[in-house]
C-alpha cells in the first residue's frame, strides 16, 4: 500500500479556503501577480507564514524541523556558482541537502541523466546555456528523492524536445509524491497534471481534474472563421488564432448565446472561463 502524504493550506496569502494536497501532480495556473510564487515560497518556508496555516501530515510545518528535507524546489529564477563545474555545483547542493558522499554522487549522476545533461557534467556553469541551467535546476530539485516537488515555471526557456522530456520525468517519478507545478504553459498542465488549480488575487478560485476544468467551458467554446468575427456576440475572449488550409480562425470563449455551434473545450478554455468568471 502506498504511503499517502498530504499537506493542508489555509489563509496563506490574502484568503485561502482550506485546500489539501495528497499524492498526485497539481498544475497551478494564474496570471502574473496572482500569488503563485508567493504560495510556493510559503510552502517551502522561504516566507514566514504567521500562525499555524501550513500542515504536513497533520503537523504545522513551522514546528517540524525535518520538513525542508521532504521538499525539492525549483524557483522561478535559479542560479549557480559560475566558477564551478555542473557536477561540482550539484554535489554541493546534494551535500547541503544532507546526502552522504556516495548518495550524492549517485543522485547527481541519475539526475543529470534524467535531464539529458550527463555530457555537460564537467562543463563550467558559466559555459551553460540558459536552457541547460534550467534543466540543471530541475535536476537539483530531484536530489535526495524528496516527497514534495515544487516547480515554479520549470519549462520556461526550454525547447519543445526538452519540455517533452520534463513531462516524461514527471510521469516517471510521480508515484507516492506530491508535485506542484506553476506554469503559464497550459499544454504542460494538460500533459502531466491530474488536478488543476486557478489562482487570482491570492486566492484559489477554481480547482478540479483536467476534465472538470475543461467542463467549465462546456457550451462556451467556439471556433469561427476570422471573417465571421463581426457576427459573434460580445462579450467574448479570444483564446488563440490559427490558420488552416490558407484560412484564419479564432478560438473564442463566451457565455453569450451565439449563432455558432460550440466545440469540445479543453483545459485552457476552462482556465479562461474560470479566470474571467464566465
What are these regions (language model features)?
Residues 149-152:
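Catalytic Walker B motif of ABC-type/P-loop ATPase nucleotide-binding domains
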